[in-house]
């Protein structure tokens, strides 16, 4: 295919309050669109209409996973299927379950809702009660970006540390970069007292092409998905992820705008090429938007890259000027010791990389559990808002590794539940380990879509982890 056949787009976007009006012209055809809000479902509808009118790719959100017809449904037990408080808006994503002498406590992501991190309680894992929020509206730490549809609060997790409860979490800073915070309380329901500053703030990058200005929200990236693991001897470890998977799409779009000949080198399908051309054109407008709007505008380009993952990385790896893009496509899991007062001590180590094809441009959501004398890390991979998102597992003989991955996901999308991810492990009522995780209802996905809480039993040996994948057939996954 000759490059001149990839006709360019002309785009005129205009902000209209919370809505966006976009006029798109290509090859003599003009269409006008209105995106009513910054929510992901409205952007997904826009991209579907764009695909209908201009032949770009349809968004993966809403596309059913590929599942063989005779594949039995897994033995995943739904625990929470509705918001248990009118102030909880998107369910219970990134669920962290802690078993205490007073039953089970759950904390979960709240995204950009005014009240950060719902706290739930259950005695039997069946009936759950909303017990408040870690940071109710107006009480979030001063170092975080705050306000309705402004702040972002993700992936909280409680741990019992001595006589206190600690909560590590992710919050967006006023610069737009994500950071990890630490709060402490005498009880899982609080009151929670933040330490007053980020515990970790790193890997923030200016990708907005708007110039460096510390007073402006131009940064992307940062750190996310923190997890505290306490070993049998009382040693404390903090795990987290370098969050650069949202960093590379707009620089890639900028590179394609500057060097349009790369589009045909990266993509073979016409729909993907047109998608890349559109992303290249809308890029400057995307730079002016809030982080999750940027993400939504670039989502189809990201999906085109993931569908051509190995080839795209190979081409970009040999392309001058793409070094930062390629580096940002790696989202390593880090780990470091924690002192008794919550300070980071010792060496920061990378313990896991997204180096398997199914993981695509990211791994995240680490959770370590000690079973059968070994350390098992559960993690999520691929795009959280699509059915490609899955749960993987790796094993090591020390909390800091080296970890050996299994080659295939432990849990992946089914006909009944899409995008299982960000798991935690806690003893069930029988004392045996259970995996707790979130998933979307079929046909749903993306930022602020409802995520349900599910669970499934786990069985460990020295060399394998077994989940009751089907109601009557255990599936054993042996480590490579």
Language-model-derived ranges and their functions:
Residues 2-480:
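Carbohydrate-active catalytic/glycan-binding domains of CAZyme proteins
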């Amino acid at each position: 295919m000759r490059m001149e056949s990839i006709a360019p787009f002309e785009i005129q976007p205009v902000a209209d309050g919370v809505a966006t009006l976009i006029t798109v012209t290509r090859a003599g055809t003009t269409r006008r669109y209105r995106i009513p809000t910054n929510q992901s479902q409205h952007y997904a509808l826009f991209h579907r209409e764009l695909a209908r009118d201009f032949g770009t790719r349809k968004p993966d959100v809403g596309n059913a996973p590929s599942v063989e017809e005779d594949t039995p449904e897994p033995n995943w037990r739904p625990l929470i299927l509705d918001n248990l408080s009118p102030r909880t808006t998107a369910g219970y994503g990134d669920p962290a379950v802690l078993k205490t002498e007073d039953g089970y406590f759950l904390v979960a992501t709240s995204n950009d809702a005014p009240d950060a991190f719902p706290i739930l309680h259950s005695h039997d894992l069946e009936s759950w009660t909303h017990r408040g929020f870690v940071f109710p509206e107006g009480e979030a730490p001063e170092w975080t970006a705050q306000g309705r549809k402004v702040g972002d609060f993700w992936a909280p997790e409680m741990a019992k540390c001595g006589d206190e409860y600690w909560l590590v979490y992710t919050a967006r800073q006023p610069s737009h970069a994500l950071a990890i915070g630490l709060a402490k309380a005498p009880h899982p329901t609080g009151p929670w007292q933040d330490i007053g500053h980020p515990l970790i703030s790193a890997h923030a990058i200016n990708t907005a092409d708007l110039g460096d200005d510390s007073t402006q929200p131009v940064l992307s990236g940062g750190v996310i998905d923190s997890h505290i693991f306490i070993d049998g001897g009382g040693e404390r470890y903090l795990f987290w992820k370098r969050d650069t998977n949202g960093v590379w799409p707009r620089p890639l779009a900028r590179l394609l705008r500057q060097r349009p000949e790369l589009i045909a080198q990266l993509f073979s399908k016409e729909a993907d090429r047109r998608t890349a051309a559109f992303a290249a054109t809308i890029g400057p407008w995307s730079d002016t938007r809030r982080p999750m709007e940027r993400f939504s505008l670039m989502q189809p380009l990201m999906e085109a890259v993931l569908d051509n993952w190995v080839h795209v990385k190979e081409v970009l790896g040999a392309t001058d000027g793409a070094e930062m893009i390629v580096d940002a496509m790696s989202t390593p899991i880090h780990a470091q010791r924690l002192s008794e007062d919550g300070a980071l001590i010792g060496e920061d180590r990378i313990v896991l990389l997204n180096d398997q094809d199914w993981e695509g441009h990211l791994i995240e959501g680490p959770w370590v559990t000690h079973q059968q004398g070994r350390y098992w890390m559960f993690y999520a991979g691929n795009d959280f808002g699509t059915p490609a998102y899955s749960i993987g597992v790796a094993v090591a003989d020390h909390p800091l590794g080296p970890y050996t991955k299994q080659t295939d996901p432990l849990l992946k999308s089914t006909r009944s539940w899409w995008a299982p991810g960000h798991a935690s492990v806690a003893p069930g009522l029988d004392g045996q380990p259970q995996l707790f995780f979130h998933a979307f209802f079929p046909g749903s996905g993306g930022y602020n879509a409802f995520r349900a809480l599910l669970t499934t039993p786990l069985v460990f040996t020295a060399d394998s982890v077994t989940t009751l994948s089907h109601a009557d057939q255990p599936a054993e996954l042996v480590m490579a």
